[in-house]
Amino acid sequence: MEKKIIFLVVLVALLALPEFISSEVIKRDIPYKKRKFPYKSECLKACAAAFTGGDESRIQEGKPGFFKCTCYYTTG
């Protein structure tokens, strides 16, 4: 019984591994001219519009900066 559980855990880990390998996180800066220090939600929306066609689920993080947003998003 223990061998079956260990086998299932290893199998699930191996099946999930390509998902982590195939998605690459990209970091890019975009200008944001509406506000000196934009809110994080504004950065997420701006990053999604600029790089993923509006798909906010692919945006990992949007960090506000001085008249810019630093975007972290995945490909694929």
Curated annotation (Swiss-Prot):
GO terms for cellular component: extracellular region. It is found in: Secreted. Residues 1-23 form the signal peptide. Keywords: Calcium channel impairing toxin, Disulfide bond, Ion channel impairing toxin, Secreted, Signal, Toxin, Voltage-gated calcium channel impairing toxin. Expressed by the venom gland. Contains 2 disulfide bonds. One of its GO terms (molecular function) is calcium channel regulator activity. It comes from the Eukaryota. Its main location: secreted. Belongs to the scoloptoxin-15 family. Voltage-gated calcium channel inhibitor (Cav) (8.6% block at 10 nM), when tested on DRG neurons. This is Omega-scoloptoxin(15)-Ssd3c. The lineage of its organism: Eukaryota, Metazoa, Ecdysozoa, Arthropoda, Myriapoda.
